[in-house]
Amino acid sequence: MLIPFSMKNCFQLLCNLKVPAAGFKNTVKSGLILQSISNDVYHNLAVEDWIHDHMNLEGKPVLFLWRNSPTVVIGRHQNPWQECNLNLMREEGVKLARRRSGGGTVYHDMGNINLTFFTTKKKYDRMENLKLVVRALKAVHPHLDVQATKRFDLLLDGQFKISGTASKIGRNAAYHHCTLLCGTDGTFLSSLLKSPYQGIRSNATASTPALVKNLMEKDPTLTCEVVINAVATEYATSHQIDNHIHLINPTDETVFPGINSKAIELQTWEWIYGKTPKFSVDTSFTVLHEQSHVEIKVFIDVKNGRIEVCNIEAPDHWLPLEICDQLNSSLIGSKFSPIETTVLTSILHRTYPGDDELHSKWNILCEKIKGIM
């Protein structure tokens, strides 16, 4: 059953806070099932942060159900350039988010369900959570071949991944979250989670590729709505709580004091890109010159998302050495970003003489450099 998480009743449903807040009073005796009314990844991730940081989960676990508009979500210690096609994402308006848990990169859209299981650190148990999801799916489709693996994934028919998993363990609280593919755009997923960038050297956590499949490909009745209700029912049964899904607005400061500042932080360039572990790009590309090709070599070190070392080499007969030197100097300290690079190269472009051929080569070089960002 879905009920609105209104100001009238929310105060009596939620757990005690570790710190005082106007939005919460009284207690919940056992546990709670929440579902977000927002499809914004940053606000939904902020709910995870808020519950982890502020709620007393002792004897009162929480299940949080949420879905997002098209988004690629990377793990805390990952490199987005290594994990996904950022250029395609920009073209298609797909968001990029970095979560606070580890693990690999996943694609979210409205055909994917996200489940977050909150407990105390002592009660944290990923395998039990996944077994609960398996029971929920089998309750709807008894003959469904779905199993949890030692890697804490869920496999359909022994080979197709329908759920990936990640977690965060704090001093007292912990959460385990996982995806559940019901009707995700599989073609789009595959295109977005394929990095086109060459020559990246990084110690960042790398995702493990896997064959994926939607539950609806197996059984068209396994829609997101059906699966959400099944998981909620099984969770309520397992934890002996009321089978009510409480709808929440993750932007409501009266219920979640301070939550919007958490969402804003998760949207910043400094968090999404700046938290990328140090990496380098060592690559080259060719450009046409007088019916032949010349090679441009590029070596860039990136730290905290900013260019620390830049060495772009082009043959003297194609582009004067001093121009490459100016470009290298200008890029050092800037964001490893096509937007910032466009601004910097446009400023430099104005300083060169009105030579059409030189300007053409300059534009070609700059477009190639932006293409690796």
From Swiss-Prot:
Which pathway? Protein modification; protein lipoylation via exogenous pathway; protein N(6)-(lipoyl)lysine from lipoate: step 2/2
Q: What is this protein called?
A: Lipoyl amidotransferase LIPT1, mitochondrial
Q: Which organism is it from?
A: Bos taurus (Bovine)
**Annotated catalysed reactions:** N(6)-[(R)-lipoyl]-L-lysyl-[glycine-cleavage complex H protein] + L-lysyl-[lipoyl-carrier protein] = L-lysyl-[glycine-cleavage complex H protein] + N(6)-[(R)-lipoyl]-L-lysyl-[lipoyl-carrier protein]; (R)-lipoyl-5'-AMP + L-lysyl-[lipoyl-carrier protein] = N(6)-[(R)-lipoyl]-L-lysyl-[lipoyl-carrier protein] + AMP + 2 H(+)
Which gene underlies this protein? Answer: LIPT1
Chief subcellular site?
mitochondrion
* SUPFAM superfamilies on file: Class II aaRS and biotin synthetases
> Tell me, what does this protein do in biology?
Lipoyl amidotransferase that catalyzes the transfer of lipoyl moieties from lipoyl-protein H of the glycine cleavage system (lipoyl-GCSH) to E2 subunits of the pyruvate dehydrogenase complex (PDCE2). Unable to catalyze the transfer of octanoyl from octanoyl-GCSH to PDCE2. In vitro, it is also able to catalyze the transfer of the lipoyl group from lipoyl-AMP to the specific lysine residue of lipoyl domains of lipoate-dependent enzymes but this reaction may not be physiologically relevant.
Q: How is its activity regulated?
A: Inhibited by lipoyl-AMP analogs including hexanoyl-, octanoyl- and decanoyl-AMP.
What's its EC?
2.3.1.200, 2.3.1.-
Domain (BPL/LPL catalytic): residue spans on this chain: 57-243
Alphabetically list the UniProt keywords: Acyltransferase, Mitochondrion, Transferase, Transit peptide
The reply to whether Acyltransferase figures as a keyword in the UniProt entry is yes
Q: Where does (R)-lipoyl-5'-AMP bind?
A: 107, 151, 161, 179, 208, 210
> Transit peptide located at which residues?
1-25
Output the Pfam families linked to this UniProt entry.
Answer: LplA-B_cat
